[in-house]
From Swiss-Prot:
<feature type="compositionally biased region" description="Basic and acidic residues">
    <location>
        <begin position="17"/>
        <end position="26"/>
    </location>
</feature>
<dbReference type="InterPro" id="IPR010920">
    <property type="entry name" value="LSM_dom_sf"/>
</dbReference>
<dbReference type="GO" id="GO:0008381">
    <property type="term" value="F:mechanosensitive monoatomic ion channel activity"/>
</dbReference>
<keyword id="KW-0597">Phosphoprotein</keyword>
<feature type="modified residue" description="Phosphoserine">
    <location>
        <position position="28"/>
    </location>
</feature>
<keyword id="KW-0472">Membrane</keyword>
<dbReference type="InterPro" id="IPR016688">
    <property type="entry name" value="MscS-like_plants/fungi"/>
</dbReference>
<feature type="transmembrane region" description="Helical">
    <location>
        <begin position="221"/>
        <end position="241"/>
    </location>
</feature>
<comment type="function">
    <text>Mechanosensitive channel that opens in response to stretch forces in the membrane lipid bilayer.</text>
</comment>
<feature type="compositionally biased region" description="Basic and acidic residues">
    <location>
        <begin position="105"/>
        <end position="117"/>
    </location>
</feature>
<keyword id="KW-1003">Cell membrane</keyword>
<keyword id="KW-0812">Transmembrane</keyword>
<feature type="modified residue" description="Phosphoserine">
    <location>
        <position position="145"/>
    </location>
</feature>
<keyword id="KW-0406">Ion transport</keyword>
<dbReference type="InterPro" id="IPR006685">
    <property type="entry name" value="MscS_channel_2nd"/>
</dbReference>
<feature type="transmembrane region" description="Helical">
    <location>
        <begin position="180"/>
        <end position="200"/>
    </location>
</feature>
<keyword id="KW-1133">Transmembrane helix</keyword>
Length: 742
């Protein structure tokens, strides 16, 4: 049994098996009151300052009950600060958006009847994203990856096709393109002339330049209509491959990429065969005519050799791009697709609850996404999330990876609730995808109200089980901060949705940069192969003799000496980007002791952002010889706090200090690992003990502001503990010499 809900183009599909007997997938949520300082349901709150993972202040102005929308700065109440140095025609200088300052006019009151999406959709609240570029919490990311791999280990991976196309509506063909129509007319005209020449004796015996008329018809047909016929042939081959599952899974990706090159190769081959067969070598011709025919023959051979070289080049680039994307982006794309599926599912009706009411056992759902081109919907695809969970990086096919890249790169994050708004307001734009962080906040508010119980400011595990099966809920909970308490607050859920949006945007930039780098490499190799094809043509025509080649080779050696460093830099840049690849777009790195954010990766250069949004351009040939620290790819990182106490402090108080710090870490286990190392680093002047406290975060330092806020809260807690234990430090008495002057 399958239930499908459609709302203006968005679709969520839930498969329900036919088994009648089932166990209740719901489980009582675990509850730990010490781990959630932000809960709104009477949970005991811990004193330390809670972490803030979204540093900009706009998001935290949202507050309100379930029935009343939070007070938000509507576009009418926002007044842009004047800037004398920025033109209205200037574009953002950073792909992550620039810092924009808004002033909220408190004299304006919000319209309570308008939805959040209506209020946010009118304006873009793009903000500086040095701390938001790659927001995925690494610990959460590792937990999710482990959970996905656990699911993959339970069932054998068959690397099945994970998608199927869904027809939105039957699209009538707009007609044949003018060039294709002209080619068809020429083909039919030549075919008619060929039939006439073969059936009428007078025309059949007629010769032009010593060659029968029908031979000229065949030669002209192969030359002018060869691409048309080979195009039909390639479409037939693709049709046969799509009907065969094994071929579709293994070679369809390369067939689509090589179709044009194979088509040109077959065309030149047919032209060469027709030319050699029609012009009989036994016929006596003048020397001038023979030289002309040889010139045409060797030119066609040179073009055929060039087509082979270009075919090999395209195949090599396709393999390189496929392997590169699988190695570097598979896990991130897999997680991003799952996040989008969660948002789509939670924004729709509780289909799992409805399936249980019928007495059926629900299964994993599907994620639907649409591909657009030039603002028009091209097609819709549906991804089976059960198969996505079972996929392994080592066995994923190139075609499957292409579908996943399309799901992330050519479509944005959208929710079912957004299409409901679109139905109510037809003047809204047709593309209702989340386009900025403020729209992500609005979407989070709508989804939260859709999932949470009435008059509740939190989401429990039972609420999620109304929309997803138990296995999927177990994958979702580790992704959201404070979910281990059993209750997800509005704030933490909003932060997670914003993280999902910024993560998707970062992956999109990474895929676009990879595509750009491959295109630049393609242009470089195309130029080299063009020169090689030209040299082959000259050699075949005896235009370039051995002596001439020696002269040219000596010139090339001199040129190579001049541009040798450039070639070396290009090769090193290629190795750095495609082989080493120490970072992706949005990763926070440390180069030469400076903390930088990767904004753009090119074949020859990488663009970084400093913490003050200053852009830094590094040649990749220089970066290849530098050690680079990558925070995003690092595991949960450690931190330390140094401070001094009096030498006379009793050892018992130092032990109490260690115990109090341990209690603080346990009470904030969502931020810190429970164990802390308190060590005496030095004794200074027999008066001061320098203590070093080593702690470990539950995140890496990708989101540096989050790390700094947690460290600040820890230092403030240590200060309070020192005050409670009356541990202090005073300087030794100092001799002061006073000299009087008359």
């Amino acid at each position: 049994m399958a239930e499908r809900r459609v709302s203006n183009g968005e679709e969520v599909v839930i498969n329900v098996s036919d088994k009648e007997d089932s166990k209740d997938p719901r489980a009582s949520p675990s509850f730990n009151p010490l781990a959630s300082p932000d809960s709104d349901a009477g949970i005991e709150k811990s004193k330390p300052v809670p972490p803030i993972s979204i540093p900009t202040p706009e998001i935290y102005k949202f507050s309100g009950s379930v029935h009343k929308p939070p007070k938000i700065p509507s576009p009418e109440g926002l007044v842009r600060r004047k800037s004398l140095s920025r033109s209205i025609y200037s574009k953002p200088k950073s792909r992550f958006g620039e810092q924009q300052s808004f002033r909220y006019d408190s004299t304006r009151e919000e319209n309570g009847g308008r939805s959040l999406r209506e209020q946010f959709g009118a304006g873009s609240f793009a903000r500086g994203s040095f701390d938001r570029a790659s927001p995925n919490n690494k610990s959460n990311r590792s937990v999710a990856s482990a959970a996905l791999s656990k699911v993959a280990e339970e069932e054998p991976d068959e690397n099945e096709e994970i998608y199927k196309k869904v027809k939105l509506h039957r699209v009538k063909r707009s007609g044949m393109k003018p060039l294709a129509f002209l080619e068809l007319v020429v083909f039919m005209a030549i075919l008619g002339a060929l039939i006439v020449s073969l059936t009428i004796d007078v025309v059949n015996k007629h010769t032009i330049w010593g060659l029968e008329f029908w031979k000229w018809c065949v030669l002209v047909m192969v030359t002018l209509s060869g691409m048309l016929v080979t195009n039909w042939f390639m479409h037939f081959v693709v049709f046969i491959i799509e009907k065969n599952y094994l071929l579709r899974k293994k070679v369809l990706y390369f067939v689509h990429g090589l179709k044009k090159n194979v088509q040109v190769f077959i065309w030149f081959s047919l032209v060469l065969i027709a030319w050699i067969c029609l012009f009989d070598g036994d016929v006596k011709r003048t020397r001038k005519t023979k030289r002309f025919l040889d010139f045409i023959t060797w030119t066609i051979v040179s073009l055929l050799v060039g087509s082979i070289l270009f075919l090999v080049k395209t195949f090599a680039l396709k393999v390189l791009a496929s392997k590169f994307n699988v190695r570097n982006f598979f896990e991130r794309i897999q997680e991003s697709v799952f996040h989008q599926y969660v948002l789509q599912t939670l924004s729709g009706p509780p289909l799992i609850e409805e399936a249980e009411n019928v007495g059926r056992v629900p299964s994993t759902g599907h994620l639907s996404f649409t591909r657009t081109k030039d603002g028009k919907v091209k097609d819709k695809k549906v991804i089976d999330m059960g198969k996505v969970h079972r996929m392994k990086q080592e066995k994923v096919s190139a075609w499957t990876m292409r579908v996943l890249i399309e799901a992330v790169g050519t479509s944005g994050i959208s929710t079912i609730s957004s299409t409901l708004d679109e139905v109510n307001n037809k003047k809204e734009r047709t593309d209702k995808e989340i386009t900025n962080e403020m729209e992500a906040v609005a979407a989070a508010y709508d989804v939260f109200n859709n999932v949470a119980k009435p008059n509740h400011n939190y989401i429990e595990e039972d609420d999620l089980l109304r929309f997803m099966i138990k296995e999927e809920v177990d994958l979702v909970l580790p992704l959201i901060e404070d979910a281990d308490t059993g209750k997800i607050t509005r704030k933490t859920f909003t932060e997670w949705v914003v993280n999902v949006y910024t993560s998707r945007k970062t992956i999109g930039h990474s895929l676009n940069d990879t595509k750009t780098a491959v295109k630049q490499l393609d242009k470089l190799i195309t130029g080299i192969l063009t020169v090689i094809t030209f040299i082959v043509w000259m050699v075949l025509l005896d235009i370039a003799s051995t002596k001439l080649l020696l002269v040219f080779s000596s010139q090339f050696l001199g040129l190579a000496f001049m541009i040798g460093s450039t070639c070396k830099n290009i090769f090193e840049s290629f190795m750095f980007v495609f082989v080493m690849h120490p970072y992706d777009v949005g990763d926070r790195c440390v180069v030469d002791g400076v903390m930088l954010l990767v904004e753009e990766i090119d074949l020859l250069t990488t663009v970084f952002l400093k913490i003050d949004n200053e852009k830094v351009f590094y040649p990749n040939s220089v970066l290849i010889s530098k050690p680079i620290s990558n925070f995003y790819r690092s595991p949960d990182m450690g931190d330390y706090v140094d401070f001094g106490i009096a030498f006379s402090t009793p050892a018992e108080k130092i032990g109490c200090l260690k115990g109090k710090i341990g209690e603080y870490l346990v009470a904030n286990s969502q931020h810190w690992y429970p164990e802390a190392q308190v060590m005496v680093r030095a004794i200074e002047n027999m008066n001061k003990l320098v203590l070093n406290i080593l702690v470990q975060h539950t995140i890496n330092f990708q989101v540096y502001v989050e790390k700094s806020l947690r460290r600040t809260a820890l230092i403030i807690a240590i200060k309070r503990i020192l005050e409670d234990l009356e541990i202090d430090y005073t300087l030794l008495p100092q001799d002061v010499n006073l000299t009087g002057h008359k």
